[in-house]
């Protein structure tokens, strides 16, 4: 038995992605996409001090630290691709469920709710070393301003070649608040 989760602010544009999530979750692997793609531009932020010295800022590091995880774990996940749990698939008896729950309890004990479930899963994969199948970004597309509509195929596609069909369009992130509120979108 498998569980496929799709956030309420996402919709299926191409069934191929659903098939990839189901196939990717075979053998107790987590099937999931990252929040990074060649179309997305910047994936890390840096606070430049002087010359070539900078403080790197990543979503994984920020959430791990604010959720009370150790400096070692926070650094371990800091530069890894951020896994977006807005869409994922997992077998019911996969070990991820218990480890995710353990990590989520730790994250929530800090009092930080926003992002806690996501960093808990990122730590389960990168620090606890659970099996993962990382799918292409078009399986959980969050760059709404990067959507391109292909009139020939009558569907949304990636902006760069090979212009693959977007599988799931996900209005995740604060940058998409206006789109979520737009009833004409």
Segments from the language model and where they lie:
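Glycosyltransferase catalytic domains, chiefly GT-A lineage
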Residues: 1-185
């Amino acid at each position: 038995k498998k569980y496929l989760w799709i956030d309420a602010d996402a919709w299926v544009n191409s069934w191929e992605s659903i098939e990839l999530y189901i196939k990717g979750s075979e053998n107790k692997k987590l099937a999931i996409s990252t929040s990074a793609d060649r179309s997305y531009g910047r994936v890390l932020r840096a606070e430049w001090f002087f010359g070539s010295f900078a403080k790197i800022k990543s979503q994984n590091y920020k959430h791990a630290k604010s959720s009370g995880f150790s400096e070692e774990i926070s650094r371990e996940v800091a530069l890894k691709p951020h896994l977006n749990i807005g869409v994922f698939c997992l077998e019911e008896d996969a070990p991820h469920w218990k480890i995710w729950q353990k990590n989520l309890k730790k994250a929530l004990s800090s009092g930080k709710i926003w992002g806690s479930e996501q960093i808990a899963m990122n730590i389960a994969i990168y620090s606890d070393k659970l099996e993962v199948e990382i799918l292409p970004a078009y399986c959980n597309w969050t760059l709404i301003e990067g959507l391109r509509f292909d009139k020939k195929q009558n569907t949304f596609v990636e902006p760069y070649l090979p212009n693959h069909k977007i599988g799931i369009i996900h209005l995740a992130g604060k940058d998409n608040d206006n789109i979520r509120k737009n009833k004409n979108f």
